[in-house]
Regions:
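Non-catalytic beta-sheet/beta-sandwich ligand-binding modules that flank or precede catalytic cores
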Residues: 1-136
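Extracellular/periplasmic catalytic domains that process cell-envelope and extracellular macromolecules
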Residues: 47, 147-151, 172-176
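Short, solvent-exposed loop/turn and secondary-structure capping segments
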Residues: 66-68, 150, 165-170
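Active-site machinery of serine-nucleophile hydrolases
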Residues: 161-181
């Protein structure tokens, strides 16, 4: 998780200050590297007010001995031998400075919410063809045209442990195949 998007009940100005903001995801403290008003997908809104503020987060150091310390929204289930989404993914933000539209005073806001059912996964959206053959799920995408208006297909067979089930986003994110797009 490299971004969190907060929705406010009114628009705020681009004067978002995150210097004293504290963020935790799944109980892991995260460093805020950037903040800005955005649309509901986390894309920056230039020179305008918005109901959304995006905080960009640095990745925590990977710890293979404490997977819970990695702040990942999925885990490997030892009983089913599959990767699964966590049941809960708490996001806590404290002391973000914002200015409401029509105001000149900044105010500090804090929020805590379960974000597991509000996942945005733009890295897997390019895999827009999804289906099933028998009990095997698949996802595919159409590559950009190469030189001479030709494309060369790349076939990736997802066969890692845990990379099965009905949610194709899990295997796409589990093995970083989206990096090949």
């Amino acid at each position: 998780v490299t971004q969190v998007i907060f929705e406010f009940n009114q628009k705020v100005t681009p004067e978002v200050v995150h210097s004293s903001t504290q963020v935790t995801t799944a109980g892991v403290s995260r460093q805020v590297t950037n903040s800005y008003v955005s649309d509901d997908q986390g894309h920056v809104v230039y020179y305008d007010n918005s109901k959304y503020v995006t905080l960009e987060l640095s990745l925590p150091s990977y710890n293979r001995y404490n997977m819970g310390g990695n702040a990942e929204p999925m885990y490997f289930n030892l009983s089913t031998w599959t990767n699964q989404w966590l049941e809960s993914y708490m996001v806590s933000m404290k002391d973000l400075s914002v200015v409401a539209e029509g105001s000149s005073q900044s105010q500090m806001v804090s929020s805590e919410q379960d974000a597991i059912n509000n996942r945005l996964m733009p890295t897997t959206e390019v895999f827009d063809e999804r289906g099933q053959v028998g009990n095997m799920q698949y996802a595919a995408y159409s590559a950009q045209t190469g030189t001479g208006n030709s494309t060369k297909p790349l076939i990736v067979w997802l066969h890692g442990i845990g990379e099965r089930g009905t949610d194709m986003n899990i295997p796409l994110l589990s093995n970083d195949v989206y990096a090949l797009t």
